[in-house]
Amino acid sequence: MPLNIEDKKAVVAEVSAQVAKAQTIVVAEYRGIAVGDLTKLRAAARQQGVYLRVLKNTLARRAVEGTPFAGLAEQMTGPLIYGISEDAVASAKVLNDFAKTNDKLVLRAGSYDGKVLDAAAVKALASIPSRDELIAQLLGVMQAPVSGFARLLAALAAKKAEGAAPAEAEAAAEA
């Protein structure tokens, strides 16, 4: 059922709002994917905070008009699904991971930091750890010396406690 002009304006406004907050947009061709598989993809995207939507390309072009993602408009042909995310790597990661298990999803292009990316660059972007993973790695590196020092102190305290126990036993035996 075709959308009337008001519905189209609403869709463009909704997508424009998502694009305004986004760091990355990834575009993939979804021709021939089963509905169940597409539902799994949408669930994975929701879990990662990725706005995933199948759009008419004309509406998508209007939504990115005047934004850093405007260069992506040339890639908007054919049946496409759009992954839009505030996290720099989330949309690339979700669509790339799904494309690994479902060969009918083909990564076409993406845009990050005002630059249009080809499929290989989107795959490279997907291989970068997310912000949360990087923070976890940094905390692990920062905690390693502290936890090592804490283990050293615990071992030293245990050794002193063992040394103090025989000394107390000797003092009790002498008395």
UniProtKB/Swiss-Prot annotation:
GO biological process, one term: translation
InterPro entries for the chain: Ribosomal_uL10 (IPR001790), Ribosomal_uL10-like_sf (IPR043141), Ribosomal_uL10_bac (IPR022973), Ribosomal_uL10_bac_type (IPR047865)
GO molecular function annotations of the record: large ribosomal subunit rRNA binding
Record's keyword terms, sorted: Ribonucleoprotein, Ribosomal protein, RNA-binding, rRNA-binding
Gene3D superfamilies for the chain: 3.30.70.1730, 6.10.250.290
One GO CC term on file: ribonucleoprotein complex
Highest taxon above the source species: Bacteria
UniProt record similarity statement: Belongs to the universal ribosomal protein uL10 family.
Quaternary context: Part of the ribosomal stalk of the 50S ribosomal subunit. The N-terminus interacts with L11 and the large rRNA to form the base of the stalk. The C-terminus forms an elongated spine to which L12 dimers bind in a sequential fashion forming a multimeric L10(L12)X complex.
NCBIfam families to which the protein is assigned, alphabetical: PRK00099.1-1 (NF000955)
Function noted in UniProt: Forms part of the ribosomal stalk, playing a central role in the interaction of the ribosome with GTP-bound translation factors.
Name of this protein: Large ribosomal subunit protein uL10
Organism this protein belongs to: Cupriavidus taiwanensis (strain DSM 17343 / BCRC 17206 / CCUG 44338 / CIP 107171 / LMG 19424 / R1) (Ralstonia taiwanensis (strain LMG 19424))
Gene: rplJ
